UniProtKB/Swiss-Prot annotation:
Its main location: membrane. The keyword Magnesium does not apply. F-type ATPases have 2 components, CF(1) - the catalytic core - and CF(0) - the membrane proton channel. CF(1) has five subunits: alpha(3), beta(3), gamma(1), delta(1), epsilon(1). CF(0) has four main subunits: a, b, b' and c. It is found in: Cellular thylakoid membrane. The gene is atpB. Keywords: ATP synthesis, CF(0), Hydrogen ion transport, Ion transport, Membrane, Thylakoid, Transmembrane, Transmembrane helix, Transport. This is ATP synthase subunit a. The lineage of its organism: Bacteria, Bacillati, Cyanobacteriota, Cyanophyceae, Synechococcales. SUPFAM superfamilies: F1F0 ATP synthase subunit A. It is a multi-pass membrane protein.
Length: 249
């Protein structure tokens, strides 16, 4: 009698395909090559921006240095508000990386004509319009807040699951599964829907009518990056917060 593992290798339990894909075959694994290509582009753009902003540091910032310091202050304030005054500093790089990567990924889908770049198969698109990217970001967030809780409280972190009453245990466990699901599908759905709407409008009315939708897409993309980073910081704040302790104002 075949085992469950053997059946799952023959009959996939679930398969999600949206659009055409460019695959890289590495052994028995098949990777979404177009996601890696666009993700590397976004990462390279962030590295170049960071190097340019730090190339000639001045005591009184101006130009790109001034802009990057403003972004850093914004991310620092976001982390402080959600995590708390005592614990936020170690998490600023993580929250900042999430926000900047998602923000630039979303905007790359709205501003860069990826589909004009021809591939052997499939087509390029924003990294965050692929469910694999958003699920990976959500799982990283889950690992981050688990690590934050354990590093702060040790085994006492499990006390959160039965606070304020043991009746909450199944709901707390369910919450650990729904958090990454909601994070990943919210981001994936919004960015993919925006790209599809703009693509359809461009095909139907290829002149100026799609412009308002594209501008709205830029705004939505920025909001989605902010929501993801805010929720990630909030989950970390919940993990490190002691019972009865409130975030600093």
């Amino acid at each position: 009698m075949p085992t469950l593992l053997e059946l799952s290798s023959v009959l996939p339990l679930a398969e999600l395909e949206v659009g055409q894909h460019f695959y890289w075959q590495i052994g028995n694994y098949r990777l979404h090559g177009q996601v890696f290509l666009t993700s590397w582009f976004v990462i390279a753009a962030l590295v170049v921006l960071s190097l340019l902003a730090n190339r000639n540091l001045q005591r009184i910032p101006s130009g790109l240095q001034n802009f990057m310091e403003y972004v850093l202050d914004f991310i620092r304030n976001l982390a402080r508000t959600q995590i708390g005054e005592k614990e936020y500093r170690p998490w600023v790089p993580f929250i900042g990386t999430l926000f900047l990567f998602i923000f630039l990924s979303n905007w790359s889908g709205a501003l860069i004509p990826w589909k004009l770049i021809k591939l052997p198969s499939g087509e390029l698109a924003a990294p965050t319009s692929d469910i694999n990217t958003t699920v990976a970001l959500a799982l990283l967030t889950s690992l981050a807040y688990f690590y934050a809780g354990f590093s702060r409280k040790g085994l006492g972190y499990f006390g959160n699951y039965v606070h304020p009453t043991p009746v909450m245990l199944p709901f707390k466990i369910l919450e650990d599964f729904t958090k990454p699901l909601s994070l990943s599908f919210r981001l994936f759905g919004n960015i993919l829907a925006d790209e599809l709407v703009v693509a359809v409008l461009v095909l139907l009315v290829p002149l100026f009518v799609p412009l308002p939708a594209m501008i709205l897409g830029l705004f939505t993309s920025a909001i989605q990056a902010l929501i993801f980073a805010t929720l990630a910081a909030s989950y970390i704040g919940e993990a490190v917060e002691e019972h009865g302790e409130e975030h600093a104002e």
